Amino acid sequence: MTAISLGMPAVPTKLADRRVSRQIQVGTVAVGGDAPVSVQSMTTTRTSDIGATLQQIAELTASGCQIVRVACPTQDDADALATIARKSQIPVIADIHFQPKYVFAAIDAGCAAVRVNPGNIKQFDDKVKEIAKAASETRTPIRIGVNAGSLDARLLKKYGKATPEALVESALWEASLFEEHGFGDIKISVKHNDPVVMVNAYRQLAAQSDYPLHLGVTEAGPAFQGTIKSAVAFGALLSEGIGDTIRVSLSAPPAEEVKVGLQILEALNLKQRRLEIVSCPSCGRAQVDVYKLADQVSAGLEGMEVPLRVAVMGCVVNGPGEAREADLGVASGNGKGQIFVKGEVIKTVPESKIVETLIEEALKIAEQMEKDGIASGEPQVSIGA
């Protein structure tokens, strides 16, 4: 009998190879080349309030942020940059709009990099030679940050709106001005609030240059909406090997941006997975309150710093299989739970003891992992089927 081909494409077993880009150094963090994708965020404080800004940077650092950006709209903010850059635990990027003088102030202050927006800095093109000279002397990278909302009027007239082509043309034009003056420590972003436009812009940019790319969906929205937009856009690009740093823009506390960014990287296996709680979404087969159980286990293991997969399952259909695949798991039913460790049932406990037992066993496994030198990391919790 002749075999019938269903015409199904082969399922890739890994992401596309990383795009080859030049590497720059943002303070202590390598960006581009073969460096890992890093997570950025931005402070929401007045930069001139040095204490509040440093406090927020400390909180971001604790959440796993690797690079932080601070706004610099006033002279008071510019005056604060030196102290903030010196005392910050992670590299500080100064975010400059409208006034070229603040670019020089940020470089003089010792910021790890400077973001410039070519769409709104007055006489920016005329200042590129001076900026390139100052940045070269201090080895300060420049991020050319193009945003759909502040695109140059010339390009809006040419394209009619902020198309992917308009964003890319703006970025590469400005990069070429720096290159004319011998400066190549450049990172580029081409942000749009529409993930489809944003993805297409980055694909075009990746095909036309070797600059490291900072990914972002601008004005992504409230936490839930912004998370979805960013996950869709970043997932598409990172799976194609495009992207060297990411920032999840949310109308939420900055630490939430970092949490989402880290989880996106972990979901794509671009970062060591941390604590991962896999729990079923619940259905009519569930014989326990899965939501409550998962929340209690998550709360009990908060802060655990080893890559541990814990399965919390509510019935006998998928429960045993998922529990066996995890480092630790429970398959619940009939008022009790079977506790699995590394695929083996070690005990059966009453429903009232499930959470307590899982936490005890998780701590035992974590202790052994730490003794064995297993890499640590920030917690991650994901709820899935």
UniProtKB/Swiss-Prot annotation:
It is an enzyme of class 1 (oxidoreductase). Keywords: 4Fe-4S, Iron, Iron-sulfur, Isoprene biosynthesis, Metal-binding, Oxidoreductase. GO terms for biological process: isopentenyl diphosphate biosynthetic process, methylerythritol 4-phosphate pathway; terpenoid biosynthetic process. GO terms for molecular function: 4 iron, 4 sulfur cluster binding; 4-hydroxy-3-methylbut-2-en-1-yl diphosphate synthase activity (ferredoxin); 4-hydroxy-3-methylbut-2-enyl-diphosphate synthase activity (flavodoxin); iron ion binding. Binds 1 [4Fe-4S] cluster. [4Fe-4S] cluster binds at C280, C283, C315, E322. It catalyses: (2E)-4-hydroxy-3-methylbut-2-enyl diphosphate + oxidized [flavodoxin] + H2O + 2 H(+) = 2-C-methyl-D-erythritol 2,4-cyclic diphosphate + reduced [flavodoxin]. Its EC number is 1.17.7.3. Pathway: Isoprenoid biosynthesis; isopentenyl diphosphate biosynthesis via DXP pathway; isopentenyl diphosphate from 1-deoxy-D-xylulose 5-phosphate: step 5/6. Its cofactor is [4Fe-4S] cluster. Pfam families: GcpE (PF04551). Converts 2C-methyl-D-erythritol 2,4-cyclodiphosphate (ME-2,4cPP) into 1-hydroxy-2-methyl-2-(E)-butenyl 4-diphosphate. Belongs to the IspG family. NCBIfam families: ispG_gcpE, PRK00366.1. This is 4-hydroxy-3-methylbut-2-en-1-yl diphosphate synthase (flavodoxin). It comes from Streptomyces griseus subsp. griseus (strain JCM 4626 / CBS 651.72 / NBRC 13350 / KCC S-0626 / ISP 5235).
